[in-house]
Amino acid sequence: MNISGELRGVSIGGGSTIQDAVIIQNMGESGITTLKIGSNCKIGRRTILSSEGDACVNIYDNVSIHNNCVVIGSVEIKPFSILSANIFISSGNHYYRHVPHRLIMRQDKEVAELHLSSGVRSTVIDEDVWIGWGAVILNNAHIGRGAVVGAQSVVTRDVDPYAVVAGVPARRVGDRLKFLPRPEISSHNLEDWPYFYEGFLHLDPESEIILRGFRFRDFVSVILSQRLEYHFEFSCSTLLKAVDNIKSIKINGKDCSFAESKDISDVVSVCVPLQFLVIDRNGSNNAFMLSVIFHSSFDSGMYLKSVKGVGVVA
């Protein structure tokens, strides 16, 4: 292993294995940790991990990176993700079209510095992602939880959770899981866990994504608290306005009964034609069970967001 730059700016967790000829370059400011490797990670032979300036390479716990990979710039790789061999991941891109008559080397450097000064986001690989042999991830792409990237693909845009993408440029060719709305979901059922993951989105073709939200025929937000029950039919505008007053909620409106909550800890957004919903949290061990009972047919899908744990309220 070859560690280049300020050693004190590199953090390696316990139980991690760094194999032969790995190069770790921390080119950030002296004394600032900009390259982090979590616990129980595996870094394969001849892999290069490089951070520079304010950019941080952050590899979370239980990540496996195979031989001959390059990870450079501002990159996050979250737990239990697998990178096959010969993968290139960067938060940047190259620029050659802004001033075509200038040398590519010069305009690329100038435009890249301009993008960095404006705060370019990181490239993010979420939990449980599998990236195939020889893939390239560029342009601050965000690979959603559970996604699969095919061998030798070039990813330049975000990938949805549990999607399977392949090609140059990478396009969606399938889904790892088929998220069909269920009449009931429970955190105690392993097959239902993906429905609780932040970022999961199930849309039917008629649903429309709009600025700062989603437009569904039915839309309601559910609050996780110590103990909470809902029993209502829909009033979209009333419910959305009520969620803004987050300290203590009492929902009343057209076709609605009421719902009260105190000490709100989290919000789950549900977009689905449902009629009855119960949340019951056991305060003694912080465990909770979420049951969603649908009274009508499924034609608008479901969207769950911002649950901080599966079966546990953080």
Task: Name every feature range the model reports, one short phrase each.
Residues N2-I137, V168, R176-L177:
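Flexible, glycine/small-residue-enriched loop-and-beta-strand segment within the central core
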Residues E6, G31, V71, L83, ...:
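Short loop/turn segments at connectors of secondary-structure elements within structured domains
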Residues P79, S248-C256:
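Short strand-turn-strand beta-turns centered on an Asx-Gly dipeptide
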Residues W133-A166, A170:
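C-terminal/domain-terminus segments
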Residues P169-R172, D255-S257:
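Short, solvent-exposed loop/turn motifs
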Residues F179-H231, S237-I246, A259, V267, ...:
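Glycan-recognition and processing domains
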Residues C256-S284:
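Extracellular carbohydrate recognition and processing domains
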